[in-house]
Amino acid sequence: MIVDIYRSAKKEGMYLYVPRNKALDELPEPLMKQFGRADHSMVLVLTPEKKLARASVEKVIESIENQGFYLQMPPPPESYMNEIPNDKMPR
C-alpha cells in the first residue's frame, strides 16, 4: 500500500496517513478541522514487514482500509514533575 503522509501545522507530532489516490478533501471535515493545515511530509510504501517509529504497521494499514486514513497522535509529553522529589509525599 502506498500512502502519503502529512504533518499537521496545528499540532507538532501529529501525522495523517492517507492512501496515495485519496484527496484530502475526501476526508471527514471534523478530522481536517482538528488536524489543521496539512503539510506533505513524504510518500511511503507500507508492507507488513515495514517498521514504523510510533505505530504498528498492521494497525495503520487496517485503519486506512476501514476508515480511509490513519491519524497518528503526538506522543504524550514527558512528565518531568514525576521526577522531582517531594519529601511531603509518601513514596
UniProtKB/Swiss-Prot annotation:
Domain YcgL: 1-85
Signal peptide limits: none
Annotated region (Disordered), positions in chain: 72-91
Top-level taxon in the UniProt lineage: Bacteria
Pfam families reported for this sequence: YcgL (PF05166)
HAMAP family: UPF0745 (MF_01866)
Designated name of the protein: YcgL domain-containing protein Sde_1339
Provenance organism: Saccharophagus degradans (strain 2-40 / ATCC 43961 / DSM 17024)
